Amino acid sequence: MKFSKLSITLAVILTQAVFVLCGMKNEDFMEKGLESNELHDAIKKPVNSGKPDTERLLDCVLSRVCSSDANCCGLTPTCKMGLCVPKVGGLLGGLLGGIL
């Protein structure tokens, strides 16, 4: 496989740019420690409900039984006949709504 001088030069320049960006991130981490890490900030945020986010998300995805739209999560926001179902408009939504 033959590579042109231009493609090799561009590959070297892009590789160096990636190394520079990684080095800048590493410097920031070494200076500020975990306090500069976004994940650390997200972990320290208070949770408004009694359940942690992962538990709420798992309950939302795994539990399809509902009594009202408030029991359904964002992926399946509509409660029909005791089950959380996606809200789909148009012809497909009409067919799915008729079946359920």
UniProtKB/Swiss-Prot annotation:
Keyword Secreted recorded: yes
Gene Ontology CC terms: extracellular region
Tissue specificity: Expressed by the venom gland.
Subcellular location field: Secreted
Cystine residue pairs: 60-73, 66-79, 72-84
GO molecular function: calcium channel regulator activity; sodium channel inhibitor activity; toxin activity
InterPro entries: Omega_atracotoxin_CS2, Toxin_23
One Pfam family from the record: Toxin_23
PROSITE patterns: OMEGA_ACTX_2
Domains as described in the record: The presence of a 'disulfide through disulfide knot' structurally defines this protein as a knottin.
UniProt-recorded name of the protein: Omega-hexatoxin-Asp2b
Lineage, opening ranks: Eukaryota, Metazoa, Ecdysozoa, Arthropoda, Chelicerata
